[in-house]
């Protein structure tokens, strides 16, 4: 790399030749920081052209926040929708987040919940609202922000049907997931983690707290 130019290494070219889009996407992820956002975008574009769904989603984030390229909400949504249609959890979650937030000027709670449900279905299947014990799916802890959103919306006052039991299970997954992120030095999640802790302590969960705390805290 030289200035704003991106020069592919021999290994990069080999990855392209072997259709290893994950290598190219991961190269972009490693460059995703303020001083090299532009380079990250170019690697994401290349991996996306190779069909990497995570890079398509990552380009959505770049356009949403203007990282390495000019912010463009319309393009961000387009990339997120493409990735979500291909089963990307983060893209579906982010669509839910964007539509659920006043910040972007397109708030639509029904649309927000639609995409949160879609994101959850990518992790635990389409039957998760029909009695599935969410606590058993540790895979959810890779997506703490999704779990926080679902826990919040299933709680009293949320925009989904109220399900205290399932809300608490999602929140406990969010708690564990955020703990892992913070332990890995990702301080950006500190505020969300505190929000989860505050909601978990709410009295609406008093009758089920002991049951699930014992389950989730078993391996801590």
Identify the function of each model-found stretch.
Residues 3-4, 10, 14-39, 46:
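Alpha-helical segment of the N-proximal tetratricopeptide repeat
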Residues 30, 62, 98, 153, ...:
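TPR/TPR-like alpha-solenoid repeats
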Residues 22-33, 58-65, 94-101, 147-156:
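Hydrophobic face of amphipathic alpha-helices that form TPR/SEL1-like repeat modules
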């Amino acid at each position: 790399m030289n200035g704003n130019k991106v020069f592919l290494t021999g290994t990069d070219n080999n990855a392209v030749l072997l259709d290893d889009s994950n290598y190219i996407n991961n190269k972009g992820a490693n460059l995703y920081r303020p001083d090299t956002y532009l380079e990250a975008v170019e690697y994401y574009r290349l991996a996306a052209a190779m069909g990497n769904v995570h890079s398509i989603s990552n380009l959505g984030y770049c356009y949403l926040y203007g990282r390495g390229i000019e912010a463009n909400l319309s393009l961000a949504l387009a990339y997120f929708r493409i990735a979500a249609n291909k089963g990307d959890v983060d893209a579906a979650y982010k669509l839910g987040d964007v539509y659920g937030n006043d910040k972007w000027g397109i708030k639509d709670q029904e649309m927000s919940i639609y995409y949160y449900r879609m994101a959850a279905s990518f992790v635990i299947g389409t039957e998760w609202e029909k009695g599935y014990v969410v606590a058993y799916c540790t895979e959810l802890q890779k997506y703490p922000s999704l779990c926080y959103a679902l826990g919040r919306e299933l709680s009293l006052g949320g925009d989904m049907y109220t399900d205290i039991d399932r809300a608490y299970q999602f929140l406990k997954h969010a708690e564990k997931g955020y703990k892992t992120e913070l332990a890995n030095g990702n301080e950006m999640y500190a505020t969300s983690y505190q929000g989860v802790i505050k909601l978990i302590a709410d009295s609406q969960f008093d009758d089920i707290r002991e049951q699930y705390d014992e389950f989730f805290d078993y391996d801590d």
